[in-house]
Amino acid sequence: IMDIVITYVDGNDPVWKKDYEKYTNVPVMQKRFRDWGTLKYLLRGIEKRMPFIRNVYLVVSHPSQVPSWADREYLKIVLHKDIIPEEFLPTFNCNPIEMNLHRIPGLDEEYLYFNDDMFPVGDCSPTDFFRDGKAVIGYYRHLFASNMYKKICRNSDRLAREALGLKPSVFFTRPQHICSPMLKSVCDEVYEKVNAQIREASA
């Protein structure tokens, strides 16, 4: 039994668009924030292929972001203000959002983090994601940080290693575009030990 956390943005939502343009002073880029309707298929896949899931949390910025067709009894809605410190809101950057997902009240120790464009297309079992209390992860190994995203990954890898007392490495890991198994207790520990850096990155 484990939980699922999904982050979601509907770039067509007038409330969200108004806030985005007000705080960023740039127009919404449709190619970046367009809703392709994939969330519905992700939820169908979870229901059909992952019967061991306890709760499904949908993390959004505002209630207007929740699709009208969503089953409110099935989906547990989490607003950014429920998990992200007020001084960092509103945010339109995925990094502060992802760094605070483990703070969802009632979240299980073992949880899976999904984007809305990731789908379970075959039958899954709990051991696909966690074994003996450890996460089964799919990561790429890199030596060079050739773009901004990889630089963020490299820095995150370094901070996590320091926080958890792991040896430094010339290599760093980058997650594949698949769901990420997460342990809440580990996230709590890293969050506490590198809180200053997290707050700086959230500002």
Spans of features found by a protein language model:
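Short, hydrophobic/glycine-enriched beta-strand segments
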Residues: M2-G11
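Short, acidic, metal-binding catalytic loop of nucleotide-sugar glycosyltransferases
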Residues: G45-I53
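Short beta-strand/loop segment that forms part of the nucleotide-sugar
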Residues: I53-P63
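GT-A fold catalytic core of metal-dependent nucleotide-sugar glycosyltransferases
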Residues: S64-Q65, N100-L143
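Long, charge-rich alpha-helical interaction segments
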Residues: V136-A203
